[in-house]
């Protein structure tokens, strides 16, 4: 939370152009974060699928024994 509060306070003393720059960077950062979240979700899903497959393989091995 502190990170978001700081730029807001800084904006008060900045010129208009600088303010616009800050808002642009923050929105691009938000986009970046969202993309990363999406990637992480995908990876998590892949990991889940892999663990399920592993479990199935283990079961099959047990059945053979």
From Swiss-Prot:
Q: What else is known?
A: The P gene has two overlapping open reading frames. One encodes the P protein and the other the C'/C proteins.
Entry function: Seems to stimulates transcription by the viral polymerase. May play a role in viral pathogenesis or transmission by insects vectors.
Family indicated by similarity: Belongs to the rhabdoviruses C protein family.
Protein's name in the database: Protein C'
Organism encoding this protein: Vesicular stomatitis New Jersey virus (strain Missouri subtype Hazelhurst)
């Amino acid at each position: 939370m502190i990170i978001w509060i700081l730029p807001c306070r800084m904006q008060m003393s900045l010129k208009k152009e600088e303010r616009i720059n800050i808002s642009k960077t923050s929105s691009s950062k938000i986009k970046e974060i969202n993309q990363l979240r999406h990637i992480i979700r995908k990876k998590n899903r892949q990991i889940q699928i892999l663990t399920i497959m592993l479990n199935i393989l283990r079961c099959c091995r047990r059945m053979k024994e």
